[in-house]
Amino acid sequence: IYFDEMRFMLAAQMCAPNSPQWFNTGLHWAYGIDGPSQGHYYVDFETKKLVKSQSSYEHPQPHACFIQSVQDDLVNEGGIMDLWVREARLFKYGSGTGSNFSKLRGSTEGLSGGGRSSGMMSFLRIGDRAAGAIKSGGTTRRAAKMVTVDIDHPDIEEYINWKVVEEQKVAA
């Protein structure tokens, strides 16, 4: 029943799915379009297990926005550089992403191996540049990215000032 109701609502223009659905859903089923796995996962409804996709179009990403976590770690899974890879995967197929970066050390905080952290802002600038370079879904619009930071983060003032400058660029 759900399948028939969804088809009716689409045909009657009563609803429209998120952009990743418009971009990708049905391409494999209707046209046989396929591509190599890009590191996505899907839930197998028969086994109820998370399965790594073998194709980039057979089980496309279903949502326009993903909230992702990031740890205060440079290169390991769940860390800063891993986040950029995960974001690129989502941007490629038309989705946006958001994260709270409050777990990252501030620029005045020490590192376990000695020295000081380069700070949260240095990594936010990298992520901003990476997102700006990617055309979301292969189209002309740029990737959508949301950044949040807790008010008690050591670099909060620098973050707010950076956001003001970026908003002024958009307004110009």
Question: Each PLM stretch: what is its role?
Answer:
Residues 1-172:
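Extended catalytic cores of very large enzyme megasubunits
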